[in-house]
């Protein structure tokens, strides 16, 4: 049994989702959003740090799966996203949790079957895969999709043995 915390980082809204994996079975444990309503970026990062710390304390995950930074058209937005992402990674690393990173296209491909899927499609598939009564909010759905992707990738790596996949701390290599 493994508990995975998925994080969809953002400087204003950071989504989180927690799933438990037992073999091929996934169980929804919780999800939500850390909302930072202050304008000051350092204060927002502090709120993200506190929020992720609280989630880890509450759910005791075995690892953290997080979305990789993508190339944004707005450099300022990309920098803020990277900082929010870095805060979540630091929290996990300070608590000795392994961190795994996944590209947004890989997450969409794994959960929906298309790397170009729309947010609504991700929400629908997360709802279906986890047997939820309603679609989760978009950022929480993305975080759950990241956790589901990690479950899928780690399960495939176990099936393949050491056949080229190395699930070490950090990126899937």
Swiss-Prot record:
CDD domains for the chain: RuvC
A GO MF label: crossover junction DNA endonuclease activity
EC number(s) recorded for this UniProt protein: 3.1.21.10
Any one of the GO BP annotations: DNA recombination
Catalytic activity: Endonucleolytic cleavage at a junction such as a reciprocal single-stranded crossover between two homologous DNA duplexes (Holliday junction)
Function: The RuvA-RuvB-RuvC complex processes Holliday junction (HJ) DNA during genetic recombination and DNA repair. Endonuclease that resolves HJ intermediates. Cleaves cruciform DNA by making single-stranded nicks across the HJ at symmetrical positions within the homologous arms, yielding a 5'-phosphate and a 3'-hydroxyl group; requires a central core of homology in the junction. The consensus cleavage sequence is 5'-(A/T)TT(C/G)-3'. Cleavage occurs on the 3'-side of the TT dinucleotide at the point of strand exchange.
GO cellular component terms listed in the entry, alphabetical order: cytoplasm; Holliday junction resolvase complex
Gene3D superfamilies xrefs: Ribonuclease H-like superfamily/Ribonuclease H
Keywords, ordered alphabetically: Cytoplasm, DNA damage, DNA recombination, DNA repair, DNA-binding, Endonuclease, Hydrolase, Magnesium, Metal-binding, Nuclease
Binding residues for Mg(2+) 2: 67
Subcellular location: Cytoplasm
Upper taxonomic lineage: Bacteria, Pseudomonadati, Pseudomonadota, Gammaproteobacteria, Enterobacterales
Matches recorded under PROSITE patterns: RUVC
Catalytic residues, chain numbering: 8, 67, 139
The protein's name: Crossover junction endodeoxyribonuclease RuvC
First-level EC class: hydrolase
Cofactor: Mg(2+)
Entry's cofactor comment: Binds 2 Mg(2+) ion per subunit.
Family: Belongs to the RuvC family.
Pfam families: RuvC
């Amino acid at each position: 049994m493994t508990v995975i915390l998925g994080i969809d980082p953002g400087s204003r809204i950071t989504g989180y989702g927690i799933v438990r994996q037992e073999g091929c079975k996934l169980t929804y444990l919780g999800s939500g959003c850390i909302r930072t309503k202050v304008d000051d970026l350092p204060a927002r990062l502090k709120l993200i740090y506190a929020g992720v710390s609280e989630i880890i304390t509450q759910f005791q995950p075995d690892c953290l799966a997080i979305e990789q930074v993508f190339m944004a058209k707005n450099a300022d937005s990309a920098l803020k996203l990277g900082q929010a992402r870095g805060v979540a990674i630091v929290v996990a690393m300070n608590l000795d949790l392994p961190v795994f990173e996944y590209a947004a296209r890989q997450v969409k491909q794994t959960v929906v079957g298309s790397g170009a899927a729309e947010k609504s499609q991700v929400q629908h598939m997360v709802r279906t895969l986890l047997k939820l009564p309603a679609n989760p909010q978009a950022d929480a759905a993305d975080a759950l999709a990241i956790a589901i992707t990690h479950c899928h990738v780690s399960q495939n790596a176990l099936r393949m043995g050491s056949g080229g996949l190395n699930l070490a701390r950090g990126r899937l290599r």
